[in-house]
């Protein structure tokens, strides 16, 4: 009867669960971290180390967090945790952006606009309460993601201290000469009722009307003469313009030409029976005339645009308004007519060229900009012949103006076109340029543009194309409009002279005094402040500005308002946000930083892409393809979400679907099972008593420590350059190849069959201990919950949390004098694959059931054979086969052959050995197993 030898084997045993059960375990860990003050402990443990500051870009305090929020916060968390392991103190202070229109709209929906049910102070208080509620909801979800940080003490742009620091930051900007005030055309949202910054604009397709309008020359003969032409009697001359915004024609004050463009004087369509010649850019003449129904291009003269400067035209429907011809660099011959109708109240280039020619001084504000903040023509807007424009919304006015002009002879062509047009990012509605009195941070006044472009060069951009992208944006951007005509925000706390409109000469000092008061009582202090308290006898000459600061200024000055307050250095080491922030937070922070300190507020800038479904489509409720992070955490756990984020190429769009989540759950199981196998085989191992020195290890064990050392160097370098996908791939490969299909498989024999305290067994356990110690650290930044769980099961004494440790220092490369080098092992592993290929058909045809039933012969050249023959006795353990013979042959190749063994099988180790039955006490065991049970035990050197 077969004796049961199971009790003599040392099979794996661990209480580390096979199933992660993350949705249940993770919340329990979070509760413990909260209870124990984990973040405070982490900071205390890292005290005195070099600082690494990842400064948090504040999400807006409105609505539940979505997948994009999760991507952003988890990427930041991975970096922060990797920095602790790398020996840094890496404080993370989360923040929230709390002012602005979305919160105002939420309060307006409930209480109406300011003055309906609530006065301004009450309205601001409701906004403050709403934002605070939203922060609490978002904070709960961010913490559930496993993100560590100072959640009990975040920065909020609504805090009195922050609001005060923001006003102090404005004082610095003023002090350095960057603030300016003027009536300039700015992006204006009629739904917001306010100016918009560049970052608040997104482009979408819009169908617009296109019209060609003729501006008749006041002195047709003079225009013809500039072309060297003699004008026949009864022939008129006009300059046609092409525009997609007919609603701006009432504000048209000039027509701009290109100084060096070539223009032709051509025969155009008749004007109510009167012949008419037109001035058109030569490159566009044929196309324009075709639009007007003129088939043949008849040219009467050529001239440069410069020859027509200062000549006068008539406005197409305001006969008393003379329209000068100006020269502008913005005019091109790409489309239209080469002549641009110029409305300085509704276009940046129009404004600049009109200012250059002194045109603005000749007109009143209502003529420059006849449109109010709701998009309606002012009461003073003159009619178009019999058509009343006053009170008409500009989007309706387009068709009305076109119809009215059909009767006048100035409408040469009308059509429709779809084109990319600026829209409000909140309302998704078209916006317009509108000249209004605003406060600006000037890009030129104190060299801000040039200084910002220089500062960009001193920042490390991830990906590298980010540098060119933001540089192009800064190079081409207009002045930064920082004023908003809204209620909920930080006031532009300036006093301006009632007559001149100039800021008080002591503005920076006064701003700081106001800031001190705001720090005690919040922004309401500004609105209740009696000017005489600060200005004394001057108070009657000055008035307070009631505009508030752009929310991009709020978030853009966090480097000034937060970091010094928390004892953290400037510039921050890293800013990390979505790729849309090149025109948003990265840029507002850059401009404010350069305006205040002549330097970027960050050393490195990293961007991530947006989340899309598996087909590359944007996730949305209407498509039904959205995946919420809360749902992932409830069903799979935060660690699965974190693994997906780490494994994705976040520099591009990040695809997610249920199938992708399933693949990540499978990858997680592979990592968890590897950890569990390591722990199972470390049962009964105490590193203080049983650890075998590296130079005394069995060579295979020493090799796996060497491989782990190589991998750790790769992983640490990848964390440092934020390449998390490489880390995940390398980890999975290590678990599958180096450990799973090789090392863990080969060492089972030693671990299970040797005596418990045998040197060969303790050697394998020591190697696994080193690998486990390193492994738990490798995964900790990504799989934070699982790493914490695993940390609690490692043998030996440890600090309380894996993040209190640093990268494992127990690994080392193979020494130069090792009996087997890394290259030797590589060759042996190739040989192992060769053996497996030879055995495959034998298994398939039933010649053997398992590799242990085959005896192997390896024939190699004399030098290789001599190198491998000392290993032959143990090669069977590497191949997990029967006995192995190595022979020398006159060949450069290596030949492997195999034959079924005829030897008996040992019931304990399952190896087929001639020694089975040689000991009468154990007739079914091989001599090796007998020795391992009763004798001194076997010795291993190689495998």
Curated annotation (Swiss-Prot):
It catalyses: tRNA(Ile) + L-isoleucine + ATP = L-isoleucyl-tRNA(Ile) + AMP + diphosphate. Belongs to the class-I aminoacyl-tRNA synthetase family. IleS type 1 subfamily. InterPro entries: aa-tRNA-synth_I_CS (IPR001412), aa-tRNA-synth_Ia (IPR002300), Anticodon_Ile_BEm (IPR033708), Ile-tRNA-ligase (IPR002301), Ile-tRNA-ligase_type1 (IPR023585), Ile-tRNA_ligase (IPR050081), M/V/L/I-tRNA-synth_anticd-bd (IPR013155), Rossmann-like_a/b/a_fold (IPR014729). L-isoleucyl-5'-AMP binds at residue 577. Transmembrane segments: none annotated. The lineage of its organism: Bacteria, Pseudomonadati, Pseudomonadota, Gammaproteobacteria, Lysobacterales. Its EC number is 6.1.1.5. Zn(2+) binds at residues 906, 909, 926, 929. PANTHER family: ISOLEUCINE--TRNA LIGASE, MITOCHONDRIAL, SOLEUCYL-TRNA SYNTHETASE. HAMAP family: Ile_tRNA_synth_type1. IleRS has two distinct active sites: one for aminoacylation and one for editing. The misactivated valine is translocated from the active site to the editing site, which sterically excludes the correctly activated isoleucine. The single editing site contains two valyl binding pockets, one specific for each substrate (Val-AMP or Val-tRNA(Ile)). Catalyzes the attachment of isoleucine to tRNA(Ile). As IleRS can inadvertently accommodate and process structurally similar amino acids such as valine, to avoid such errors it has two additional distinct tRNA(Ile)-dependent editing activities. One activity is designated as 'pretransfer' editing and involves the hydrolysis of activated Val-AMP. The other activity is designated 'posttransfer' editing and involves deacylation of mischarged Val-tRNA(Ile). It is an enzyme of class 6 (ligase). GO terms for biological process: isoleucyl-tRNA aminoacylation. CDD domains: Anticodon_Ia_Ile_BEm. A motif ('KMSKS' region) lies at residues 618-622. GO terms for cellular component: cytosol. This is Isoleucine--tRNA ligase. It is found in: Cytoplasm. Keywords: Aminoacyl-tRNA synthetase, ATP-binding, Cytoplasm, Ligase, Metal-binding, Nucleotide-binding, Protein biosynthesis, Zinc. It comes from Xanthomonas axonopodis pv. citri (strain 306). Pfam families: Anticodon_1 (PF08264), tRNA-synt_1 (PF00133), zf-FPG_IleRS (PF06827).
